[in-house]
Amino acid sequence: MFRVQRLRMFSTSRALYAGQNMTEKIVQRHAVGLPEGKTVVSGDYVSIKPAHCMSHDNSWPVALKFMGLGASTIKNPRQVVNTLDHDVQNKSEKNLTKYKNIENFAKKHGIDFYPAGRGIGHQIMIEEGYAFPLTMTVASDSHSNTYGGIGALGTPIVRTDAAAIWATGQTWWQIPPVAQVELKGELPAGISGKDIIVALCGVFNQDQVLNHAIEFTGDSLDKIPIDYRLTIANMTTEWGALSGLFPVDNVLLDFYRNRLTKVGNNHPRINEARINELQAKSDSLQADPDAKYAKKLIIDLSTLTHYVSGPNSVKISSTVDDLSKQDIKVNKAYLVSCTNSRLSDLESAANVVCPSGDINQVHKVAEGVEFYIAAASSEVEAEARATGAWQKLLNAGCLPLPAGCGPCIGLGTGLLEEGQVGISATNRNFKGRMGSKDALAYLASPSVVAASAILGKIGSPAEVLGTKDPNFTGVVATVEDAPATSADGKDVADESGASGSVEILEGFPSEISGELVLCDADNINTDGIYPGKYTYQDDVPKETMAKVCMENYDPDFQTKANPGDILISGFNFGTGSSREQAATAILAKGIKLVVSGSFGNIFFRNSINNALLTLEIPALINMLRDRYKDAPKELTRRTGWFLKWDVSQAKVYVTEGSVNGPIVLEQKVGELGKNLQEIIVKGGLESWVKSQL
């Protein structure tokens, strides 16, 4: 049972409250080419030079793109990290050749390289100090959010971005709206970080944090260990966020002091001097008391119990007690992945299978159930062997796999087969991700996964241990939204970081305008924009791309939309695959700007990387929907409203009848700096990189 209370925050202009949140402060440190005195804020487009950039099995495709750009040297080899972690069980000649190519490339260019078996890239980034508090660290992987668990701003990038960083040391980022998530109350005994994030995904399941950066706060933080924080940050990806940032506090500083005892003081990135420096500057890089947030979500941890996500969706969360009553039989269980395969996770599962502590007295995995385990890294596995946790799990009948991603990504041994049910401590349970699309996948904490493997059905550790879970009456949670515009459509958004006037690069327009053409639907995917049957045809001419643009969404789009129009659509526009043609087909149609309530993140990055401009204006799509709520349904509609984006003032004006007609909406948007303008003028990120070589 969930009880969510919705409140409205008192809206004020940031001209009065000028503080930065933690996300903005970290971006400020890594932004390059800012105008003098510029303070970055949510919405701004900035060029960034991240501290580190990790790629894994996709390092070879990135390398091919890098070489295809004409690049021959890595700008800063110390910035780049290559790991092999996804398909480590695959010993085919093709995969081994790819792995060897990555290793040889790394050696040639002096890149830090970690071979198959060393562990999952995200875990290595934390163990080896590449991801470090108060820095920005990116990776060509969607679970880069994980780094937020140790106070680093981690966010995913696409392969073109990675190649750009390899070649030039930098790429671009638009600072997202930032949501504050307050964790209050004391977490009941036995309830874990996985239960927290699964509950958050289930309680706030209406895209409240889609494409937001998240900052965690609250009086509960001093009792939430780093392993829990890493799990929570990791699954902010599934929650829809672009980052999930925890503060630097005594819990984190103690974590690094303990880490120092393991790596020694001569480690290049984790050493006493760096930890002391972190402690000294941590206060100045915490969120200011008057920091601005797009919204605030509050959850009372004292009201949580064991939660299970699914089947086949992270937006569906149930208590383990409710599912236990349904007697859902389990065929496979998994304790693997960057989400929950650290030492504390393995020990949590071991405590369920071996509550007495006697390694020879264990609860056995139920007959007919396969329980797979893999440590997050070789270091974690060694520690688990030393503590006895690994042997307890093996004695219970668990099946070990090498440190790596494996079943989580649907690779290697132990995948779900047709009709089977799996329960996993991983992060995604999308249909077909862990095997057959006709299987059911649930997500849960390590202790619940272990208990379910023993019981042969989804169940609680209390059922195995003969104990009783705390009384549960429902999660208490609250949402506080800050309006982006006032009732009359006037902007009340943040202007404290505005420089007053954005300098315009020669060749870039100071204004962009056109009639709004409405494609009134949410979740228009990349196949709707550019049909999949053309995706792998490399010789499709521009004229054909223009003709098939939006074909699968609405065949009439071709006759209703004209070159020079501005396309506007609903929320999560461009969800789906990573095909770049979804952006280039819109450009081929002669449309230079797309406006939506929100974008799929990969489409958003592919758009800018290919010189297609985008703006998120939720208020505008809501106004248009209200305008046409009683009109006959049209998939594509010419609105008679015109949008003018004054790039120099970072404002948009929506008018009726013509560009000079009466204003129906005026709103501040993020500043598009000269560095980003240059990418557009050059024709996209790849062309910009070539110009820098």
From Swiss-Prot:
Organelle transit peptide residues: 1-17
The protein's annotated pathway: Amino-acid biosynthesis; L-lysine biosynthesis via AAA pathway; L-alpha-aminoadipate from 2-oxoglutarate: step 3/5
E.C. no: 4.2.1.36
A single Gene Ontology CC term: mitochondrion
Manner of cofactor binding, per the entry note: Binds 1 [4Fe-4S] cluster per subunit.
Residues annotated for [4Fe-4S] cluster binding in this entry: C338, C405, C408
CDD domains given in the database record: Homoaconitase, Homoaconitase_Swivel
Gene Ontology molecular functions: 4 iron, 4 sulfur cluster binding; homoaconitate hydratase activity; metal ion binding
Keyword Amino-acid biosynthesis annotated: yes
Domain of life: Eukaryota
Matches recorded under Gene3D superfamilies: Aconitase, domain 3, Aconitase, domain 4
Cofactor: [4Fe-4S] cluster
GO biological process, one term: lysine biosynthetic process via aminoadipic acid
PANTHER family membership: HOMOACONITASE, MITOCHONDRIAL, HOMOACONITASE, MITOCHONDRIAL-RELATED
Main function: Catalyzes the reversible hydration of cis-homoaconitate to (2R,3S)-homoisocitrate, a step in the alpha-aminoadipate pathway for lysine biosynthesis.
The family this protein is said to belong to: Belongs to the aconitase/IPM isomerase family.
Name under which the protein is recorded: Homoaconitase, mitochondrial
Native source organism of the sequence: Kluyveromyces lactis (strain ATCC 8585 / CBS 2359 / DSM 70799 / NBRC 1267 / NRRL Y-1140 / WM37)
Organism lineage string: Eukaryota, Fungi, Dikarya, Ascomycota, Saccharomycotina
